[in-house]
C-alpha cells in the first residue's frame, strides 16, 4: 500500500484500502488494533515522520489516543470535534453558536440526520429548533467529552467547551492538525460502516 500510495498510509487510507479480512482481524484484537494506537504502530514500524516526533513524544499522542478510543454508541461527538477542527484552523474553545453550525453542517449531510432518531422523518428533522439542537449538544456530546476526555475537554468561561491549556502549544502544528482530521474522519466512517453494515457506506476500494 505504501508503494502504491507513494507515502505512508494514514488511518483513512488503511480503512479504505485494507483487505476486509485484515481489517476484521485488527478489530478483533483490541490490544493490537492499529486504529486505536496508530502513532504507536507507526513508531514501531520505523515510519514516524520527523514532523511527527513532537506529537508522539508529547501530550499530543495521548490526545489522539483519546479521540481514537472514545466511546461512540452514537456519532454525536464527531460534529463537536469538527467544530474544534474548524477546517484546519484549530480552535482552543467553541461557543454554542459554533457548535450549532458544525452540528447542523454534519447532520444536514446525506442521511446523517437519521442518527438523531431512527424513527424521525426528514420533515421532523427540519422542524427541530436551534434551541433543541443546542440542548442535545450540551447534554450529550459536550457532557460526555468532559466526563470521559481525560481532562482534555474542559468548561471555560465564555465558551461551551474548550481544550485543555496543555494543548495550546501544539494545536498549530501541521502534524497535530493532520492527525486530528484523520482520526475524526476514520471514526465517522467506521461508525457508519458498523451501523449500516453492507448499506450505503462501503469501505473497501482497490488501489491502482
Regions found by a protein language model. Give the residues of each.
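Intrinsically disordered, charged low-complexity linkers and terminal tails
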Residues: 1-208
Amino acid at each position: 500500500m505504501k508503494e502504491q500510495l507513494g507515502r505512508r498510509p494514514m488511518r483513512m487510507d488503511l480503512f479504505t484500502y485494507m483487505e476486509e479480512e485484515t481489517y476484521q482481524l485488527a478489530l478483533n484484537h483490541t490490544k493490537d488494533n492499529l486504529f486505536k494506537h496508530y502513532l504507536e504502530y507507526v513508531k514501531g514500524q520505523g515510519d514516524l515522520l520527523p514532523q511527527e516526533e513532537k506529537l508522539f513524544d508529547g501530550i499530543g499522542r495521548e490526545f489522539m489516543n483519546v479521540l481514537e478510543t472514545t466511546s461512540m454508541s452514537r456519532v454525536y461527538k464527531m460534529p463537536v470535534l469538527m467544530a474544534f477542527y474548524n477546517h484546519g484552523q484549530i480552535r482552543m474553545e467553541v461557543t454554542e453558536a459554533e457548535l450549532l453550525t458544525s452540528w447542523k453542517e454534519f447532520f444536514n449531510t446525506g442521511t446523517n440526520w437519521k442518527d438523531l432518531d431512527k424513527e424521525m422523518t426528514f420533515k421532523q428533522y427540519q422542524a427541530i429548533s436551534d434551541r433543541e439542537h443546542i440542548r442535545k449538544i450540551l447534554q450529550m456530546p459536550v457532557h460526555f467529552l468532559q466526563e470521559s476526555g481525560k481532562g482534555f475537554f474542559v468548561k471555560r468561561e465564555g465558551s461551551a467547551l474548550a481544550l485543555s491549556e496543555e494543548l495550546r502549544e501544539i494545536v498549530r502544528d501541521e502534524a497535530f492538525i493532520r492527525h486530528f482530521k484523520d482520526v475524526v474522519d476514520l471514526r465517522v466512517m467506521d461508525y457508519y460502516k458498523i451501523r449500516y453494515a453492507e448499506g450505503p457506506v462501503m469501505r473497501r476500494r482497490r488501489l491502482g
